[in-house]
UniProtKB/Swiss-Prot annotation:
One of its GO terms (biological process) is negative regulation of translation. Keywords: Ribonucleoprotein, Ribosomal protein. Pfam families: Ribosomal_L13. This is Large ribosomal subunit protein uL13. Part of the 50S ribosomal subunit. InterPro entries: Ribosomal_uL13, Ribosomal_uL13_bac-type, Ribosomal_uL13_CS, Ribosomal_uL13_sf. This protein is one of the early assembly proteins of the 50S ribosomal subunit, although it is not seen to bind rRNA by itself. It is important during the early stages of 50S assembly. Transmembrane segments: none annotated. It comes from Rhodococcus opacus (strain B4).
Length: 147
């Protein structure tokens, strides 16, 4: 008997909604990345996009542990001499909290075509409202110790 190999068409996708209020950013990103990749399913295969859709709400209320709010910096470069720009995590969280959460989750996905396809199933919103109520998302609870 041959081993079952999942195909992309065989996958049934569900929608999960995660409330990021007071959840540590890294722990949130790990759980979201596992749901996106499909590692919670018995039919997981690393070469197949078999994951679910993930909607993260309240990204502006995510917890940043330690001194990272002021002490950790995010960098990008324009390509021109002297074009290095840096912002602290606190500045990014105040201005674009959805981008900060999305960058944390996408950083835990594969860096190839499959990873880019998987990252398109991630939806992040700064507030409590999202336009995906028609998909009937299932609430996903992240278990953590209180800070």
């Amino acid at each position: 008997m041959s081993t079952y190999t999942p195909k992309a068409g065989d996958v049934t996708r569900t929608w999960h909604v995660i409330d990021a209020t007071d959840v540590v950013l890294g722990r949130l990103a790990v759980q979201a990345a596992n749901l996106l990749r499909g590692k919670h399913k018995p039919t997981f295969a690393p070469h197949v996009d078999g994951g679910d859709f993930v909607v993260i709400i309240n990204a502006d209320k995510v917890a940043i542990s330690g001194n990272k709010r002021e002490g950790k910096f995010l960098y990008h470069h324009s390509g021109h001499p002297g074009g290095l720009k840096s912002r602290s995590v606190g500045e990014v969280l105040d201005k674009n909290p959805d981008r900060l959460v999305e960058k944390a989750v996408v950083g835990m996905l594969p860096k190839n075509k499959l990873g880019r396809a998987i990252s398109s199933k991630l939806k992040v919103y700064a507030g409590p409202n999202h336009p995906h109520a028609a998909q009937q998302p299932v609430p996903f609870e992240i278990k953590q110790v209180a800070q």
